[in-house]
Amino acid sequence: MKRTLVVAGLWLASALALAAPVAVKGYNHVKSVGAIDEYTLQSNGLQVLLMPEHSTPTLTFMVTYRVGSRNEVTGTTGATHLLEHLMFKGSKNHTREKGNNVDQLLERTGAKYNATTFLDRTNYYENLGSEHLATVVGMEADRMRNLLLREEDRKPEMTVVRNEFERGENSPIQALYKEIYQSAFVAHPYHHSTIGHRSDIEKVSIAKLREFYDTFYWPNNATVTIIGDFEPAQALELVKKSFGAYPHSPKPIPEMYTEEPEQTGARRVIVKRPGQLGVVAVAHKVPAATHADFAAVQLMSAILTDGKNSRMYKAITNKNLSTGVEGDLGIFHDPSLHMVFAPLAPGAKHEEVEAIILAEIERLKKDGVTEAELQAAAAKVAADAAFKLDGSFGIAGNLNEYISAGDWTLFYGLDEAAKKVTVADIQRVAQTYLTENSSTTGWFVPTQPGAGGAAKPAKAGHQAERAGGPFYYRDPQHSHGSVGVDLASAKEPGGSGGAAGAKMAPNVRRSTVAGIDLMAYPTGVKDVVTLRASLPAGRAQAGAGNPSIPVLTSMLLDQGTKSQDKFAIAEKLESVGASISFRAGTDVLDITARMLKKDIPLVLGLIAEQLRTPALSAEEFAKAQKQLAGGIKRSLESTDFRASDAFGRAVYPQGHPNRPVAPDDMLAAIESAKLDDVKAFHADHYGPSNMKMVVVGDVDVAALQAEVGRVFADWKGGKAVARAAQSAPAVGATTQDVAMPGKTSVSVVLGQPSGLRYSDSDYQALRLATAILGSGFTGRLMANVRDKEGLTYGVGAGLGNDMFNDGDWRITATFAPALLDKGIASTQRQLTLWYDAGVTPAEISARKSNLIGGFKVDLATTGGLANTLLAAVNRGYGPAWLDEYPAKVQALSDEQVNAAIKKYLKPQSMVVVRAGSLPAAQ
């Protein structure tokens, strides 16, 4: 029998001071927990959650429906997700024909918006300027009960969702995850994936979807959440005006009552597909998120799999048997699974890794955990409690999971419950849930290594991941909202505490400290601090030398220093819930850190120590070689990677920093790399010269400057970023094929060198024109190739790789093999029309509103602001650029925008790359 977690009452009295309930006619105030007030609309039972937070002029509006794939049966699997897609196709008062459908309405505001479907829920959200609250309330209310649900919309959207299904099937890990759930659950509907079975996706009728809509989309089965800059009384009136027009559902919402019978023996699944490296996963059934044991299960999972001091890292990853063990534990309404995923390193055996995972689980059950392990896991929970309050969008996203689990107060309650977990609790839940009889073990076994070499010219006649997660209306990994990432989406100063339109640059405290260009931006967020930094030690800095050396050097930074080993460093970070990461990009070493205010000295000291005096030991060097080789081999399983990789080599000449090294060549370079080369690269390229550091959040500027000066004192050295001559488009179009048998979706890249850096005078004009072609659902590509023709889940166009050197212009898309030629032809048809006829004044005006209107959204978190400020200075602008950007976009003339298309692009000379199971290869 399920036990309910009851912790809110223990601390409710102290939390009430944070809440500010208001009395509005027509509502019942239910309770206040933490900073959140819960109301019920009396007329129809709609639940409303409000959390005012005025540090930035943005808000997030979200509607969560308590219907997910757990409410589906055989024959209708995937219906919840397909219905989610159709929720964007028009409602009574919001249609494409009227020029105000969801995409047209929201993209004009610059909103971030999407929808997700998962096991227990479907949710729709908008993150936008607070002045647009009335707009989104009216739109969301309209589609709650006035959806058009037309057959002419279902047909093309079915093939869109089918391509989304096919894309997921391309991933061995996602396929294994799906098979494990199908084996672990035989009765409960968690058995089937949220995306559904292919035949159900293809055959579900519009009548069945209408029945689903009329059963579950009612106010009494929904929660409206508003987080951010708004006045509660006004917001409640807006919600009542729009959502209050609908009655309570005419029938009770059907209850999903199926319970999974007790499992009486271990289960196994094996997935065999083309791929590079194997995977081992071990899953056990665990209780629902509302169960009293769940907080202990979360901490147990962290002790097993989270960080360098986790049990699985030490037993598997640290012994070169995996490229990185991960744990998977969702926040679900019903009992689900805890999984340990171990992608195998080259040469590792499934049997050996599985045996180690099981042995570590048994050791945990037999011997328990130490107090130090528990305190480190609890510290992460405490820090995450602060981090999840960094921006309205993150708060709403976290809250959504607890709403769907059945108790939104778990947003606070699980954090409180974690404080009370003991080492005895950890051992008890391990013994209770990590049993052999409740386990399902899965292997992914690659049947062939797949093609790993360079792309081959196409034959004549052919024209031009978390494993388990929700399914989205639009791919969250694909930028639809802006083109030219980083600075392109710079917004008003999130967290500055100023009013909309306030200048950003005066809030940036810029100074040179110990040779480092240091920028600090204090915001209104409490406790949270994000650090972003860079120095010229990226992959391009290898020059004509071994291309793996910069990457291997970056990988060794967090593997111990001359003063302490990696486990001691990890223990210090984990004890306060902080994190530091290093990554060698194309041009620079990227440094990211997140911490609480009190831990700034600790984190800065560790960053300085890791940059200045890494151990660079032979033992860790050998491990890094194997890890890097394993990562490259695993990337060869991705059609997206293979297409982008081949495209990069096709458009950039030898010696250009942006030209990728062929995978086979990089694997050979890793094997031949020498530790002495790493030491020489570190000595030559690491130093404060050209290093930039941005710190944003709850920061004392003077104290920060003093601490940076102390920990980096007397550090010398460093290099400038590698520069290159401009690339030139090829003469004559070419098509390159990368054959990857067994893939159900083909990735396509079409484009050319742009010849532009972000700082060039024509860049913004071409960027705006490109956004009209390929950004968002109002972009021509998505509006036609996806929405009208239903040929793809995702297609877009953008500029990129242009921070320090000239970059490229590209269109990316995915198509089913059977629709490949038709999809490419449709894409090229839109490209030709855009190039020949140009863009209209109306399109230019709307896209300017999108870019400028979205200015105040992306910087509403410390991370977003830090990323954007660092990108600005790396591109040669001062912080003032963030204030100047809207005016520069607004000043672009129609003539400039259209002239940029013709000046820089040559569709007749573009490269097309196709990667996947190609018709010619079948």
Q: Residues of each region from the PLM?
A:
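Histidine-acidic residue clusters that define the catalytic metal-binding segment
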Residues: 22-39, 103, 138, 164, ...
